[in-house]
């Protein structure tokens, strides 16, 4: 009877103690550490020697069996979500198992996506290396990064990694790489894009080409020569310098790229070699020399000298010289008129038009008029005269004498005011 009583008393004390698994924190986020503890409430560790092992689902974690009742997990990830439990083994190979505990790992969505460039500022020389760095301020787990070119969105590359930043590299930048870029990051909660970043590719100027343009095939003194310099490649703005031999003629700017022109009025000293230089701050390039040769005719020099002397004399003598020259010309004109027509005598020979006295109406003789040049102002005078036959009767002579007395004093008669169609008499003669 006594052995049975002792068995009933000792039975509860001899049963294996219950195990509990404790996770700290119990609801971890991705990337955070977690500590697992295998615990027996009524059993002190000094009372017995145990070996512990931790499991997730059916897989053992850590180093396997260990004397430590704790397991430290450095970082938990979304895929670490599952059912966890632990086991304890006594020296007598008795194994105790805890209940299962569900641990859910929470993922943080990506946020605040940004795109940066290296070199900074988005300006890069042609042929240099360009790096596009996509970053997120927050987000956990595996993040997929994608890079796009242009507002339309040409996909360049994608990377998936457990990191807050990722890089896309262009080893050697070309002119066609000048565009707008952006990146997208996502970790299972939808894509989150960055802002647009403009990339400017700076291109050094190529060797410029110089062209000389003259108004004629053979350039001459006083012609305006156009010097046109153009670099076919190069980022604007471009500054052009123009040279005659090694003498600087001037400069012109092309703010939007392309070429520029410089005009030069040619003199005798402008024969020789011309060149130009292009510079956009990334290095200067000089054109090949262009030779311009032209000759100055001797006659042109003497004519140029004579006209210069005359112009100098006129400018020195001034209005007095002009007045004297005018008076001299007027005097010559008056003398020429006097020699040709002294005292405005009748024209000789007389016009061969006749009116005979034996006509049926002898009293209706018509005078013959000819215009005389202007005497003064705008008045025009005419010359009137008669012709008489050499052989006439006595009666006719008497009549002719009477008629001559009547008109002899009336040789000049004023006819009318001058108009624009009157012709100078002496000019008509």
Curated annotation (Swiss-Prot):
Compartments where found: Cell membrane
Modification after translation, per record: Phosphorylated on tyrosines upon activation.
Topology of the protein relative to the lipid bilayer: Single-pass type I membrane protein
Motif (ITIM motif 2): 367-372
GO cellular component, one term: external side of plasma membrane
Pfam families for the chain: Ig_3
Motif (ITIM motif 3): 379-384
Cytoplasmic compartment segments: 329-429
Motif range (ITIM motif 1): 354-359
Positions occupied by motif ITIM motif 4: 410-415
Residues glycosylated per entry: 293
PROSITE patterns linked: IG_LIKE (PS50835)
Residues in Ig-like C2-type domain copies: 17-104, 109-200, 208-291
Residue numbers on the Extracellular membrane side: 17-307
Disulphide bond pairs: 38-86, 134-183, 229-276
Superkingdom, taxonomy of origin: Eukaryota
Primary localization class, coarse: membrane
Xref: PANTHER family: FC RECEPTOR-LIKE PROTEIN 1 (PTHR11481:SF117), IMMUNOGLOBULIN FC RECEPTOR (PTHR11481)
Description of how the protein assembles with itself and partners: Interacts with ABL1. Interacts with GRB2 and SOS1. Interacts with SHIP-1/INPP5D.
Name of the protein in its database record: Fc receptor-like protein 1
Native species: Homo sapiens
